[in-house]
Amino acid sequence: MPPIKRQPGGWVLPGYKYLGPFNPLDNGEPVNKADRAAQSHDKSYSELIKSGKNPYLYFNKADEKFIDDLKNDWSLGGIIGSSFFKLKRAVAPALGNKERAQKRHFYFANSNKGAKKSKNNEPKPSTSKMSENEIQDQQPSEPNDGQRGGGGGATGSVGGGKGSGVGISTGGWVGGSYFTDSYVITKNTRQFLVKIQNNHQYKTESIIPSNGGGKSQRCVSTPWSYFNFNQYSSHFSPQDWQRLTNEYKRFRPKGMHVKIYNLQIKQILSNGADVTYNNDLTAGVHIFCDGEHAYPNATHPWDEDVMPELPYQTWYLFQYGYIPTIHELAEMEDSNAVEKAIALQIPFFMLENSDHEVLRTGESAEFNFNFDCEWINNERAFIPPGLMFNPLVPTRRAQYIRRNGNTQASTSRVQPYAKPTSWMTGPGLLSAQRVGPAASDTAAWMVGVDPEGANINSGRAGVSSGFDPPAGSLRPTDLEYKVQWYQTPAGTNNDGNIISNPPLSMLRDQTLYRGNQTTYNLCSDVWMFPNQIWDRYPVTRENPIWCKQPRSDKHTTIDPFDGSIAMDHPPGTIFIKMAKIPVPSNNNADSYLNIYCTGQVSCEIVWEVERYATKNWRPERRHTALGLGIGGADEINPTYHVDKNGAYIQPTTWDMCFPVKTNINKVL
């Protein structure tokens, strides 16, 4: 209870009613946000006192909430109040907050030796089925730390769990998917391995193709690696994807929770032909999330560095590198002034320039992301918008007809079954073909940068990037305009090339014809006009989920050609690297312990979904196992199974990847 001998209004800051100690619980209406937070803080203190605890001598949850409530309050009272309790947090012991005390504990692996206890009282991974009412905030299981909003918002927390021996368990394996009417939750865990890259150095590397006319490139390779979760197959099993595309008319990601835990840091010791792997209890790994996208983008769609599809596969993290400039424009040939000016402006990004955690064996980090993006629609149009009419009813529309082969003309009434429409095909470019050979690294259409005065020797390929592909919504005329990708079955050396099939939606594969009195000619290039109608490109389980929309002053309609979701702020890249541990040498040359780190990474995503509802009487097509293939060592194993050698049988055709927009009919 507050002291009996106190001033009636309490010891508050001038102009405030609650911001200060010993004021009454009902002192009138709070004057601002800081005063309102102080009122709530006083009520919490009163409850703690009634329970027999003294909140004035210990830092407690009420103090933590008060700091959090004022984190964006820049008033004088808010700053003073927040600063006071931050100081209290630093010097006062915690009141009954075991987790906070545990996080303060310095985790050496031997510190918990022999301390293994029953985990019945510990929170289990969220493996129970979640109903709609149980999903309160559209998020997977979250850490206790606060969450920053925004598409790329992320927070990290370091903590640990109980364990024994030389390892400290900081979490269990999570997996499986849960389906409700409004949300689907996917949960996956993989074992990962990260090693020292570039001997802890940054390097500039030139990538020069064997064909002198091809695209050369300049790359900055770094000592960092990273995690990439950008593919549907990393999150949905084939059966889960089958269920998603068979039962829901649209879906989109809403929240993602990533946890990196159960870290084990090993030192590699070589003694002649013998190699020993020892636990290193004091070495560390650096880890942070680029939630603000301050560093060049690493997760390009269709890269092979994504989280493995199979839960038992080890995820070997790729090295991070980025392109600092167009190499052809920065060679400074013949002292070219333009190229010299470009070369002098090349940026250099060092990831050590950001705050980050340094974790040791037994510690963990967690990150949260919020998505703000459009839907992936799964319905197909069974007719084009030009046929949205009743063909039995006559129309009042008439048209001007020019007779074949002469200049005579007449006006006639439009037939009921051929009524005109206001809706036009979507845009696209088809009047080009790819330039060979393969080593030239070119595409049917190229977009580049060519500053006046620069000297370009390698041709357009040297300063250009290819569209992928530029068909838009138009019907592909050549293979250049079809989305294609390679599938590399695990454990084999056979690459399979998958080519997209027709999407079966009448708002894709569109064509535009122009009459010339005697016939019609195909318009290969269709620009953007009013009243164009089209559907986005259909995705499959093998597609990337998102792509980062470039930062620019202006842009037209955003519609990635591969169906991925363009995002201003996709999930920030989570970077990781081994800590640098120098060792002495005779000539003071750089020498470091040879270490690596392995651990578990779990990724939980909440997907917002809508079930389909239809008045269609007839059965509709659905994805089934009957459309899959047979393969493997003896050609007896079905797709998405393993053969006698353990090789995973991957799909070999577009339909085996279960594309969207092929099953559920929609009424336009």
From Swiss-Prot:
UniProt keywords, alphabetically: Capsid protein, Host cytoplasm, Host nucleus, Hydrolase, Lipid degradation, Lipid metabolism, T=1 icosahedral capsid protein, Virion
SUPFAM superfamilies reported for this sequence: ssDNA viruses
UniProt-listed Enzyme Commission number(s): 3.1.1.4
Transmembrane segments: none
Enzyme class at the top of the EC tree: hydrolase
Chain intervals for the UniProt region annotation (Phospholipase A2-like): 11-66
Residue interval(s) of motif Nuclear localization signal: 611-622
Single GO cellular component term: host cell nucleus
Function: Capsid proteins self-assembles to form an icosahedral capsid with a T=1 symmetry, about 26 nm in diameter, and consisting of 60 copies of three size variants of the capsid proteins, VP1, and VP3, which differ by the presence of an N-terminal extension in the minor protein VP1. The capsid has a channel at the 5-fold axis and there are densities extending the 5-fold axis into the interior of the capsid. The capsid encapsulates the genomic ssDNA.
Entry note about domains: The N-terminus of Isoform Minor capsid protein VP1, VP1u, contains a phospholipase A2-like region. VP1u may play a role in the disruption of host tight junctions in the airway tract.
Protein name per Swiss-Prot or TrEMBL: Minor capsid protein VP1
